[in-house]
Every structure is written in C-alpha cells, then in structure tokens.
Amino acid sequence: MGIESPTASSYIKHHLQNLTYGQHPDGTWGLAHDAKEAADMGFWAIHVDTMAISIALGFLFLWLFRKAAKKISADTPSGLQNFVELMVEFVDGSVKETFHGKSKVIAPLALTIFVWVFLMNFMDLIPVDFLPATAQWIGVTLFGADPHHVYFKFVPTTDINATLGMSLSVFVLIVFYSIKVKGISGFVGELTLQPFGKWMIPFNLLLEGVGLLAKPVSLALRLFGNLYAGELIFILIAILPWGVQWALSVPWAIFHILIIVLQAFIFMMLTIVYLSMAHENH
C-alpha cells in the first residue's frame, strides 16, 4: 500500500480524492497535496485525472471505430469489425425503437454516449493500487512524489463533474431541439400552458420547470452514484486481507460488469427518450 501504513479511513479518503490542479490561496498554481488544498482552489480547479482519462478514452473510441471502418471486409471480418458492427446495430435498433423524430444526429450521438460511458465505467475494473504499485515497481515518481502519495482516480464517471458535464450537454440539446422543432413560443407555451391551462401559468411553470431541470440532474446523479458506490466497494475490499480480497473481488467484479454496461445503456436510452420528447410537436 505505501511506505507508511495508512489507516483504513485515510486509505479510503486517499483513493476517493481526485488529482486536482488549480490556484492556491497564495496566488500560485499547482497540484493539490490534500483534500483541503483541493477544496481551497474553488470552482475553477481542474480534476486532471478525470480530464486526462476521459479524453484518452474518447480518442481510443474514435481510433478503434475508424480503424474498423477503414479495414471493413464482408468476407473475413475481424473481431474488432464484428464488435463495432454489433455496437452500431444495437444502438441503431435502440434509436429506431425509441426516437420518433427525424434527425441524423441522434444515432451517432447515442453511439458515442454508449461507448464512451462504457469505456469510462470499465476503468472501474482496474485495481485501485495499480498505478502507484506499477510506478513504484519500475522505480519512477509520479508528479515528483512517491507514487503511493499521489491522488489519481481512474474512473471519470465517479467524478460528479464529469457526469454533470455530460448531462448538461444533453440538457443543452434538449432545449435546442425543443426550440428548433416547436419554436420559442411553442417551447415557452409547453412550460407555461401545460398541464392546467393559462389560468395556472405560475404553477405550470414551476411544475414543468422542475421536470425539465430534473432531467440532467437525474442523469448525472444516477451514473455517478452507481459507479461511485462500485468504486467504494472495491476500495473497501482492498483493505481486507489478501485471501479475502480475492474471494470477494472476483464475484464483485463479475457483477460490476453488469452495472458498467447497464449504466451506459441507461444513460444512452434516457438521452434518446429526452431528445425524442423534444422533437414531439403537440
């Protein structure tokens, strides 16, 4: 675990802390060395690990699918081509069943969301001490510090900033397509004249406004909560004796694969449903 034997509490807190870069109270910029320093950096602090892993996985997704598209073959398809075709057909079928509007953007968007979120979720299967243990084994430091003293989270979807950022992007698309399809007057009317007519405009606005704002919040919290809980269980298992770790981690990892796929699917499907509702012109 480390040169100093940490307590269970400090071990858990360490593995739940992001690698944070921002401005210190004295005006200098740099990495936070503990949770308090990260909190003092305020709103504009950047979670470097979340940004790096999510961007890297995004490029991995693009590279894999581009590689499969360039080497497509009808005679002897490769394993990668079969996987890509399976993903495309699955997402395309889901969009056709759920989305009732006309748009060439929704299917590619749904595919991107599903694969990207799946890859980010899949990082939860990496052992919690893999990075510091590997760095220490090859004899290198991380950011100039002992590997076991560096904060780094592998799973972007256990960071509420990442899940909220994705859900807010979906929210922007919901508002954009609502206005594009229904017009500004139609969109405003949907918020103010339903479900109880013009005499109840304040109540309608409150009801519909809360419902609209709840969409990105629920999207973000559902994904974050499930993956954060899964990561926390892996960390708790890592505290246990070696033999018990294997007895618990393997079954939990197998079960967690279902959660990884399911949460990516739910995020994608809710996005399709919300955008389908935005395209409905009553």
Curated annotation (Swiss-Prot):
<protein>
    <recommendedName>
        <fullName>ATP synthase subunit a</fullName>
    </recommendedName>
</protein>
<keyword id="KW-0997">Cell inner membrane</keyword>
<keyword id="KW-0472">Membrane</keyword>
<keyword id="KW-0813">Transport</keyword>
<dbReference type="GO" id="GO:0045259">
    <property type="term" value="C:proton-transporting ATP synthase complex"/>
</dbReference>
<dbReference type="Pfam" id="PF00119">
    <property type="entry name" value="ATP-synt_A"/>
</dbReference>
<feature type="transmembrane region" description="Helical">
    <location>
        <begin position="232"/>
        <end position="252"/>
    </location>
</feature>
<feature type="transmembrane region" description="Helical">
    <location>
        <begin position="106"/>
        <end position="126"/>
    </location>
</feature>
<dbReference type="GO" id="GO:0005886">
    <property type="term" value="C:plasma membrane"/>
</dbReference>
<feature type="transmembrane region" description="Helical">
    <location>
        <begin position="160"/>
        <end position="179"/>
    </location>
</feature>
<dbReference type="InterPro" id="IPR045082">
    <property type="entry name" value="ATP_syn_F0_a_bact/chloroplast"/>
</dbReference>
<keyword id="KW-0138">CF(0)</keyword>
<keyword id="KW-0812">Transmembrane</keyword>
<comment type="subunit">
    <text>F-type ATPases have 2 components, CF(1) - the catalytic core - and CF(0) - the membrane proton channel. CF(1) has five subunits: alpha(3), beta(3), gamma(1), delta(1), epsilon(1). CF(0) has three main subunits: a(1), b(2) and c(9-12). The alpha and beta chains form an alternating ring which encloses part of the gamma chain. CF(1) is attached to CF(0) by a central stalk formed by the gamma and epsilon chains, while a peripheral stalk is formed by the delta and b chains.</text>
</comment>
<keyword id="KW-0406">Ion transport</keyword>
<dbReference type="GO" id="GO:0042777">
    <property type="term" value="P:proton motive force-driven plasma membrane ATP synthesis"/>
</dbReference>
<dbReference type="GO" id="GO:0046933">
    <property type="term" value="F:proton-transporting ATP synthase activity, rotational mechanism"/>
</dbReference>
<keyword id="KW-0375">Hydrogen ion transport</keyword>
<dbReference type="InterPro" id="IPR000568">
    <property type="entry name" value="ATP_synth_F0_asu"/>
</dbReference>
<feature type="transmembrane region" description="Helical">
    <location>
        <begin position="45"/>
        <end position="65"/>
    </location>
</feature>
<comment type="function">
    <text>Key component of the proton channel; it plays a direct role in the translocation of protons across the membrane.</text>
</comment>
<keyword id="KW-1003">Cell membrane</keyword>
<comment type="similarity">
    <text>Belongs to the ATPase A chain family.</text>
</comment>
<dbReference type="InterPro" id="IPR023011">
    <property type="entry name" value="ATP_synth_F0_asu_AS"/>
</dbReference>
<dbReference type="InterPro" id="IPR035908">
    <property type="entry name" value="F0_ATP_A_sf"/>
</dbReference>
<keyword id="KW-0066">ATP synthesis</keyword>
<keyword id="KW-1133">Transmembrane helix</keyword>
<feature type="transmembrane region" description="Helical">
    <location>
        <begin position="253"/>
        <end position="273"/>
    </location>
</feature>
